[in-house]
Amino acid sequence: MKFIDEARIEVIAGDGGDGSASMRREKFVPFGGPDGGDGGRGGSVYAIADRNINTLIDYRYAKKHLARNGENGRGSDCYGKGGDDVTLRMPVGTIISDMDTGELIADLTEHDQRVMLAQGGAGGLGNLHFKSSTNRAPRQKTDGKPGERRMLKLELKVLADVGLLGMPNAGKSTFISSVSNAKPKIADYPFTTLAPNLGVVRVGPSKSFVIADIPGLIEGAAEGAGLGHQFLRHLQRTGVLLHLVDLAPFDESVDPVAEATAIVGELRKYDEALYEKPRWLVLNKLDMVPEDEREARVADFLDRFGWDGPVFEISALTGQGCEALCYAIYDYLSEHSDAHRAAEAEDLAADVRFRDAPPAKGGATPGDDA
């Protein structure tokens, strides 16, 4: 199935039914009075998170979603039937926002989470409600209210604990297939990965974490070059980033330090918050480096790269060093998961506050250019 992580849709809730202006007419009841029923409410449109769905492809082509209108009221105090609701099932991790106002409507982070996207209109009142001591035969009634109509942007950010960064052909797909149940396409040419892959890494009974592999980045990605920039958003929810570096490139003219520096630069240009995330350096393809040269090559790389954070040396192909890396990741996530969730909740709250901020004097809104 094609991976789609962004879509735009229109949701239209049903209109409420009109109230009825009817009089009771029965034999032997000369003053029957009003008996007009209310109109039914319009159907609403809901979104529900479903962990069994992993793409927004259904909404790339089905762009309009309508709920039914409520039925009109009738005589004999008959109320109109309410319109049927419409439920849209979306992947866990979907962010829903209003394209016209910029309002953040929902962030679907849990399975079966249900959110109203457009509310159906209220039904109109029948003339039964307008009867009084001075108006025994009212002819008044009210029409149903129109349902909400919204243009929405759907944006999927996969929920992963760990994100993989690196140039094309750095060995990210080989690594995720080596340590998890993911089966990405693997080949000896760049840009093999064209869409994010998720894998569950198990380090023991009831001990696991989710890792995300996105297409490789290239220099200029923040400005749109290559494929990886389209999927960097999927790393924004992760707790730690693994920066994979090919320590033994086939092309001897390629400098691993220059490539690693370019990746860090693109990360910073795309999102400062993403750049500030905990990041570990993973030096891959050690099996391609002669044993007597490994220590010197690693030391030279770290010295020229100027890295003083966590470093792991692995071979994704042979599995060397992968087990120790996975245990270190799990221990780190276990220790920092509460802080990570709190920070993510604060970021979401700040986003909501920003979007709901009142317009500034002169009609300008937050984020407008001066």
UniProtKB/Swiss-Prot annotation:
Chain spans, region Disordered: 128-147
OBG-type G domain span: 160-334
Keywords, alphabetical: Cytoplasm, GTP-binding, Hydrolase, Magnesium, Metal-binding, Nucleotide-binding
Cell compartments where the protein resides: Cytoplasm
Annotated EC: 3.6.5.-
Binding site for GTP: 166-173, 191-195, 213-216, 284-287, 315-317
Cofactor(s) the protein requires to work: Mg(2+)
UniProt keyword Nucleotide-binding present: yes
Gene Ontology biological process terms from the UniProt entry: ribosome biogenesis
Main location: cytoplasm
Signal peptide (from-to): none
Annotated binding of Mg(2+), by residue: S173, T193
GO molecular function, one term: GTPase activity
Obg domain boundaries: 1-159
Entry GO CC: cytoplasm
Self-association state and partner proteins as the record states: Monomer.
Functional note: An essential GTPase which binds GTP, GDP and possibly (p)ppGpp with moderate affinity, with high nucleotide exchange rates and a fairly low GTP hydrolysis rate. Plays a role in control of the cell cycle, stress response, ribosome biogenesis and in those bacteria that undergo differentiation, in morphogenesis control.
Family listed: Belongs to the TRAFAC class OBG-HflX-like GTPase superfamily. OBG GTPase family.
This protein's name: GTPase Obg
Provenance organism: Burkholderia cenocepacia (strain ATCC BAA-245 / DSM 16553 / LMG 16656 / NCTC 13227 / J2315 / CF5610) (Burkholderia cepacia (strain J2315))
